[in-house]
C-alpha cells in the first residue's frame, strides 16, 4: 500500500476548531512536523479538509 508524507506548513492558531482537530488527528503538532500515513480515502479526505495548512508527498 502506498504511503503519504504529510508536513504541517502553517499554524492552526487561527484555523477553525474542526480543522485544528483534523490536523491533530493526522498526528501533526507543531509547524514542520512530518508524519507518514497510509494512502486511503479517509486520510485523503482529512488532507483535503486542511490542504491549505499541509504539504503532501507520495512515497
Swiss-Prot record:
One of its GO terms (biological process) is translation. CDD domains: Ribosomal_L30 (cd01658). Keywords: Ribonucleoprotein, Ribosomal protein. One of its GO terms (cellular component) is cytosolic large ribosomal subunit. Signal peptide: none annotated. InterPro entries: Ribo_uL30_ferredoxin-like_sf, Ribosomal_uL30_bac-type, Ribosomal_uL30_CS, Ribosomal_uL30_ferredoxin-like. GO terms for molecular function: structural constituent of ribosome. Gene3D superfamilies: Ribosomal protein L30, ferredoxin-like fold domain. PANTHER family: LARGE RIBOSOMAL SUBUNIT PROTEIN UL30M, MITOCHONDRIAL RIBOSOMAL PROTEIN L30. Belongs to the universal ribosomal protein uL30 family. Part of the 50S ribosomal subunit. This is Large ribosomal subunit protein uL30. It comes from Ruminiclostridium cellulolyticum (strain ATCC 35319 / DSM 5812 / JCM 6584 / H10) (Clostridium cellulolyticum). The lineage of its organism: Bacteria, Bacillati, Bacillota, Clostridia, Eubacteriales.
Amino acid at each position: 500500500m502506498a504511503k503519504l508524507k504529510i508536513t504541517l506548513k502553517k499554524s492552526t492558531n487561527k484555523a477553525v476548531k474542526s480543522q485544528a482537530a483534523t490536523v491533530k488527528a493526522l498526528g501533526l503538532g507543531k509547524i514542520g512536523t512530518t508524519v507518514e500515513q497510509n494512502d486511503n480515502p479517509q486520510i485523503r479526505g482529512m488532507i483535503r479538509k486542511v490542504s491549505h495548512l499541509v504539504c503532501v508527498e507520495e512515497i
